[in-house]
A protein has these predicted regions:
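N-terminal Rossmann-like NAD(P) cofactor-binding subdomain of oxidoreductases
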Residues: 1-113, 136-137, 143, 186-190, ...
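Contiguous C-terminal substrate-recognition/catalytic subdomains in enzyme active sites
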Residues: 109-216
C-alpha cells in the first residue's frame, strides 16, 4: 500500500518556518507552489510570498523526464513559438526508485507503460513554461501527448520529441537557439550549474545515456 505522506510532512515543516525543497509529486501542481527548473522559471519563486506558512515555504522540482524536455522546449518557445509536442520516453531503471523494477522484469525487456508518468509529462510543462503573477501561474497553451517506456538502462533517460512550431525555422536557427540558451544559474555562476544547459550533437547516433549522462559533471 502506497501512502502519500510526503505532502503532509512537507506542510508541517513549512508551518514551522522551514524552507522545504521537495522532489515528491504532492504539491507540484498547487497554484502557489513553484515547480522549479531554475534555467527556465526562476521568477516563479515569487509565489513563495503567497504561501501561508508563517515564514516557511515549499518549492518543488518536476518529474525527471519533464525537466529534460522543457529545457529543450524553452528556447523554441522563446524564438519560434510552439503549438504542439509529441514525446516518447525511454526511461532508465533508476527513475523507478527503490526497489524499482525487478531484475526479471527489466533484463532483456522494455516495459511500455509507467503509471502516472504520462500525465506528469503532459501537465507539468504547462505550469513550468507559464507566466507568473502575484499568486499563481498562467499556464502556457500547449498540447502535449506523451508515451512513457521503462528500458533496461541503469541511469539516463532518452526522449524522442516532435514539435509543431508556430513560426517557420531552419535547422540552423533551431540549433543556434539551443546553443545560445542559458539561464539564471549560469548568469550567477552557481557551483553545481552546468556550463551549458543544452548540448547539441551533430553525430546521428548521439545522444546516448551511457556516453553522455555525466557530461558537464552530470
Amino acid at each position: 500500500v502506497v501512502v502519500p505522506v510526503a505532502g503532509e510532512v512537507e506542510e508541517e515543516f513549512a508551518k514551522q518556518g522551514y524552507i522545504v525543497i521537495s522532489n515528491s509529486k504532492n504539491h507540484r501542481m498547487d497554484e502557489d507552489v513553484p515547480l522549479l527548473v531554475p534555467e527556465i522559471n526562476s521568477d516563479h519563486l515569487q509565489l513563495i510570498k503567497a504561501q501561508k506558512f508563517n515564514g516557511g515555504c515549499i518549492v518543488t522540482n518536476p518529474n525527471c523526464s519533464t525537466i529534460g524536455m522543457v529545457l529543450a522546449l524553452k528556447p523554441l518557445i522563446d524564438n519560434f513559438g510552439l503549438d504542439a509536442v509529441n514525446v516518447v520516453t525511454l526511461q532508465a531503471l533508476s527513475g523507478a526508485g527503490y526497489p524499482g523494477v525487478s531484475s526479471l522484469d527489466s533484463i532483456d525487456n522494455v516495459i511500455p507503460y509507467i503509471s502516472g508518468e504520462e500525465d506528469k509529462l503532459e501537465t507539468e510543462p504547462l505550469k513550468i513554461l507559464g507566466s507568473v503573477n502575484s499568486h499563481s501561474i498562467n499556464r502556457i497553451e500547449l498540447k502535449i501527448s506523451a508515451q512513457c517506456n521503462r528500458v533496461a538502462v541503469v541511469d539516463g533517460h532518452l526522449e524522442c520529441v516532435q514539435v509543431k512550431l508556430k513560426n517557420k525555422a531552419t535547422k540552423e536557427k533551431i540549433i543556434e537557439a539551443w546553443r545560445n540558451f542559458s539561464g539564471e544559474p549560469q548568469k550567477l555562476n552557481l557551483p553545481t550549474a552546468p556550463e551549458k544547459p543544452i548540448y547539441y550533437f551533430d553525430e546521428v547516433k548521439y545522444p546516448q545515456p551511457r556516453i553522455h549522462r555525466n557530461i558537464d559533471k552530470g
